[in-house]
């Protein structure tokens, strides 16, 4: 009975997390685009530092390491890297007939391919070695360099005052001047209705009253948009933790091995924010945010999360925590997104990627992967 109660509770938590996730993704996608426009920089760069931060993945990995489950942590890292590309980025492509990507997207997708290659080479080179911590230090340093490079690009973009801010203020000034020159306000329009019963004049006054309300509605400040963006990001992180924790417990209740839980259920759960953001980005024709969502997340995974895993992970568990098949799929996924960003995305590409991801999951489950539990 206790097992059934635990299973039902975690399924309910999973569903509740999905609702919070949708709210956070909607807030984030709207205000990221606005903030990027106000800062006069590419939405890709803003997303790389915000949405592209897999903080929930880092929490999951640290918790798994504290529980002496390095194999689950590695499985989650590999599974999430594959899911972000084949199951998240592909969903965004389904909502866009044709996607063209900017220069920032091309630069960082190539950086992802390089960093993924380095991560896998280090994973193979230090397999079972007590010196794996050295590889972890290198990956953490790479993460620091990545953050500095993105931050510097955003900073340089803010040095030039965006024209939109000036136009907003000038529009407000023109609206005020127009109001004064017309010689009417919303209050006067209302008084006109009382003094003159003429239907034509009443209609005209009502239209003028509505026009003044629209003119007097000022655009939101930059601080308000940043707050809304942060609120959406916070909702994404909290919902991701709830979903990841409940999915992990569901996996254990169903007697799945640690690695299978990491590469399938856990990676699917922790990458749900990327799926929501990719869908919204595709539906709203924001290819830059789609790339930032995927590439930024995977760079975070293979650098900071990978570095933490190498430094504090158990070498013997990491040795059996992955197969050549998983490493190959992870590397090919990075090649695929690099090629799509260079050539341009098409809807049929998203379909092919989704089919490939389903095949990956089927192979993982059929393999059993119970060696790590023996």
Describe the predicted segments one by one.
Residues 1-374:
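Hydrophobic alpha-helical segments, chiefly the membrane-spanning helices
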């Amino acid at each position: 009975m206790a097992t059934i109660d635990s299973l039902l509770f975690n399924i309910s938590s999973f569903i509740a997390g999905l609702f919070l996730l949708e709210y956070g993704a909607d807030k984030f996608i709207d205000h990221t685009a606005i903030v990027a426009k106000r800062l006069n920089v590419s939405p890709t760069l803003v997303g790389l530092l915000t949405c592209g931060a897999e903080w929930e993945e880092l929490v999951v990995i640290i918790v798994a390491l504290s529980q002496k489950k390095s194999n689950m942590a590695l499985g989650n890292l590999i599974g999430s890297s594959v899911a972000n590309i084949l199951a998240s980025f592909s969903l965004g492509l389904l909502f866009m007939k044709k996607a063209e990507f900017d220069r920032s997207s091309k630069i960082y997708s190539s950086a992802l391919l390089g960093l993924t290659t380095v991560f896998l080479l280090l994973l193979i080179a230090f397999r079972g070695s007590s010196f794996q911590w050295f590889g972890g230090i290198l990956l953490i340093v790479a993460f620091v360099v990545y953050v500095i490079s993105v931050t510097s690009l955003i900073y340089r973009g803010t040095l030039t005052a965006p024209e939109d801010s000036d136009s907003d203020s000038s529009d407000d000034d023109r609206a005020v001047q127009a109001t004064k020159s017309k010689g009417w306000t919303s209050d006067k329009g209302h008084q006109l209705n009382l003094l003159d019963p003429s239907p034509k004049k009443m209609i005209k006054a009502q239209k003028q009253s509505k026009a003044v309300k629209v003119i007097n509605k000022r655009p939101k400040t930059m601080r308000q948009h940043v707050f809304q963006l942060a609120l959406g990001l916070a909702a994404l992180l909290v919902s991701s933790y709830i979903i990841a924790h409940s999915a992990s417990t569901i996996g254990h209740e169903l007697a799945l091995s640690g690695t299978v839980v990491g590469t399938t259920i856990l990676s699917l759960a922790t990458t749900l924010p990327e799926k929501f953001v990719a869908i919204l980005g595709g539906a709203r024709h924001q290819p830059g945010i789609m790339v930032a969502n995927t590439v930024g997340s995977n760079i975070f995974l293979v650098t900071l999360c990978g570095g933490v895993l190498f430094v504090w992970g158990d070498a013997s568990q990491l040795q059996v925590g992955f197969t050549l098949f998983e490493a190959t799929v992870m590397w090919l996924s990075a090649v695929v997104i690099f090629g799509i960003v260079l050539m341009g995305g098409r809807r049929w590409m998203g379909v092919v990627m989704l089919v490939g991801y389903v095949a990956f999951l089927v192979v993982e489950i059929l393999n059993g992967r119970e060696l790590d539990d023996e």
